[in-house]
Amino acid sequence: MKEFDLESYDYDLPKELIANYPILPKEKAKLLVYERRSQKITHTTFEHVLDFFPKNALVVLNDTKVIKARLFGSKHAFLPSKTTEVFFHRFFKNNTALTQIKGKIKVGDKIFFDAHYYAEVLELLHNGQRLIAFYGNKTPLNQENILKLLEQYGHMPLPPYIKRADESLDAHEYQSVFAKHMGAVAAPTASLHFSQNTLEKLLKDFKHAFLTLHVGAGTFLGVETKDIREHQIHTEVLRIPKKSQEILQKSQEVLCIGTTALRSVEYFKRLENPNQEAFECDIFLHLANPILHVNHLLTNFHLPKSSLLMLVSAMVGLEKTKEIYQIAIEKKYRFYSYGDGMLIL
């Protein structure tokens, strides 16, 4: 069936529609509103986004914070040029970290960030991942100090389709105004559309709940299996505070800010008796595993053959999604992380 065929999720996007910079002020970004019941499409801007939110809906937001996950160092302490890139993915046990390292590397290699700080390769894992430990003055760093190291020496992990180096503006624009808990290596991009003023109005006028899904580097990996149902999606760290859990359990109508919030809600609501706050989220939503517990979604326009495009198709239908995306292309909407948005009602 074509809805499970990977090629059905391909489309052509003119390169000039890939957003390399955000629209400022945020309210000027374009917004496509699609009402599923009437199939009506409205073209507006984020200045009016809250006008379309259903008054009784619970709005769910992901408050993860992007860390400066890209580090550059040298394999020799005395070399001033830093050409070896270390991409921090997530913490592992005993204060070690899962990373990707560009170029040839072997167990025991050290990568120096300055005269005091370096990383040592402990193990070569599958999928190109490397297990490393960080050191300061030859002493192993704990997670708190690793985060300080990343903040001091790291670069914002812009997506691979943004063909430029990170700049000073990315430190705050590739971060939602409600970002709180450090751990993501990619931004939950629908959240980037909210200015402080819009957020304050949302929190004042709507029921809301926060959760934390630390977006992993796997979010940029395309689906590669010919039958999308065979795809194994990446696992991400999820935390839902008890207060938010209670609100979610009572809510009948849910609007999620972004696919990460939606996946988190769907994962949580399918658990029989959740009795903890921390989870490992690995839910893959598509037409054979449809959305059951979320009614509305604010999202960006996603990459061809991506699991996120399949999620949108699970909500809207494959043909309607392709039709809407074609309209967005014709109307010159800007795509991907720094692009415009789409509200599905």
Regions found by a protein language model. Give the residues of each.
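Surface-exposed, charge/polar-rich loops and edge strands
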Residues: 1-345
